[in-house]
Amino acid sequence: MKKALLTLFLALTSCICAMAQRPFEGHFFCKELGVNLYINLYEETLTAPGFSFLGKMHGYMKDGIYGTWMITKCHIDGSCAHIRFSNDIGSDTQDVELKIKDDNTYDYHAIGGNAVRKAMGRKLVKVSGDMTFVRVK
């Protein structure tokens, strides 16, 4: 019984440590706009729904905004990730800084203005260039 509990404890500890070592991987949500962000900035392992013909990528952002925005370029610099998103028709790009605020909270900041839009009625309006994303468990 003691061995089983010890094994379980060690397994949980190693899982928690693994998550802490890869902070730029997971599913994140911005409650303010209803935007979902799915990222793995370490490896190209994700496929955007409806865009499987593009193959694996580092991530994408969808829901609460117009279309799907896919990561076309990224690099990590300590607790900050520099990301370039392109929209699903390839007409717009957006450079973003994603900074770790704490273990589960990330600050999204659009560089050079924001190209991401959402539909309001029959118009497309720009969303805020600053968003807060929280890790979804």
Language model regions located:
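Positively charged n-region of N-terminal signal peptides that target proteins for export
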Residues: 1-4
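Short, solvent-exposed loop/hinge segments that bridge or flank secondary-structure elements
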Residues: 22-51, 86-96
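Sec/Tat signal peptide C-region and signal peptidase I cleavage site
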Residues: 16-20
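Tryptophan-anchored aromatic micro-motifs
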Residues: 21-38, 57, 108, 131-137
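N-terminal glycine/threonine-rich, aromatic-flanked beta-hairpin/loop signature
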Residues: 35-76, 110-113
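Short hydrophobic/aromatic-rich beta-strand segments that constitute the beta-sheet cores
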Residues: 30, 48, 81-85, 105-110
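Bacterial N-terminal signal peptides
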Residues: 7-15
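Edge beta-strand at a domain terminus
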Residues: 21, 64-80, 103, 109-137
